[in-house]
């Protein structure tokens, strides 16, 4: 028997392209939520596998699911934007079709916003990594995630909590739909890492921000290496990655949030740059090194101007990258 849905208060947008191997678990994590009052818009973005059929089956058995189909792939940004236009609930969140919500995620996120009156709440997340059994095991909360979400803070501004700027993923948050429409926020289309600039726009335009330390999402690292974040050795992927970080910093700059800029520059140099330098050192294409070197030089100049303290390892890698 199909469940009788409660009046929904939050819409979860679930884009997916060729995620048939993971979609059932993602959708089951929605149905296992302690909060019943949700609906989900499932966007099949031109899949060539059984993703569309799985989405359709879910919608046929549970009226809380609605399916939107793109006959040809348009990308995550376009998929999310198309679904955003259909949202009728007060709150909206996101879940990628290969990730997993923790059982109490929606209740905690929506209850926090209801209690505080803030525009957006960000929670913690962990990597879901392949294990020796052929399955996946969740990891620990990483330091930059803890810095953004611990301890719980309600009704703060970006100026009061600049480290929240390090939480740049779409799917660890719930926000008021009114915030998106008031500020005219849309995801960039035709680009990878499209959520980074959107996160900074949400933070800079929110009237108040909440953060909670609860792990709300398990973010999958696919065993077959097919997710976008596992292809940073591609020059094209690197280009979009660097541009997304530049664009996010530009949003913070334009809004006058110097402390958040400092926090973001430090985090990128400490966390994002070292693995990219390691890739560049063995990469066969000089274009990769030149692009990364130019980006690191920009951030190094900014770090020096802002007197941002960096650890010794980061300084060493920065020096190597600038020489490219």
What are these regions (language model features)?
Residues 221-324:
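C-terminal subregions of glycosyltransferases and related glycan-biosynthesis enzymes
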């Amino acid at each position: 028997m199909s469940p009788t849905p409660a009046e929904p208060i939050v819409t979860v947008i679930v884009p997916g392209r060729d995620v048939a191997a993971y979609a059932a678990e993602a959708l089951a994590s929605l149905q296992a939520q302690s909060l019943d009052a949700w609906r989900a818009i499932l966007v099949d973005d031109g899949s060539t596998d059984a993703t569309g059929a799985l989405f359709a089956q879910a919608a046929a058995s549970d009226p809380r699911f609605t399916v939107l189909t793109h006959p040809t792939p348009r990308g995550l940004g376009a998929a999310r934007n198309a679904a955003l236009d259909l949202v009728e609930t007060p709150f909206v969140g996101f879940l990628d079709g290969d990730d997993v919500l923790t059982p109490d995620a929606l209740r905690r996120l929506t209850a926090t916003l209801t209690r505080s009156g803030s525009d957006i709440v960000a929670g913690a997340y962990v990597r879901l990594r392949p294990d020796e059994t052929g399955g996946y095991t969740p990891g620990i909360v990483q330091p930059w995630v803890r810095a953004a979400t611990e301890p719980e803070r309600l009704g703060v501004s970006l100026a009061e909590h600049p480290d929240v700027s390090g939480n740049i993923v779409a799917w660890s948050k719930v926000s008021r739909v009114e915030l998106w429409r008031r500020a005219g926020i849309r995801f960039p289309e035709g680009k990878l890492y499209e959520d980074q600039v959107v996160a900074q726009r949400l933070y800079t335009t929110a009237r108040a921000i909440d953060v909670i330390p609860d792990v709300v999402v398990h973010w999958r690292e696919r065993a077959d290496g097919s997710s976008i974040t596992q292809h940073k050795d591609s020059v094209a992927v690197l280009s979009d990655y660097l541009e997304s970080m530049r664009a996010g910093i530009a949003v913070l700059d334009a809004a006058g949030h110097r402390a958040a800029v400092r926090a973001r520059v430090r985090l990128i140099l400490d966390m994002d740059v070292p693995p990219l330098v390691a890739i560049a050192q063995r990469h066969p294409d000089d274009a990769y090194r030149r692009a990364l070197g130019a980006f690191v030089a920009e951030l190094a100049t900014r770090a020096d101007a802002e007197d941002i303290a960096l650890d010794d390892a980061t300084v060493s890698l920065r020096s190597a990258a600038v020489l490219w």
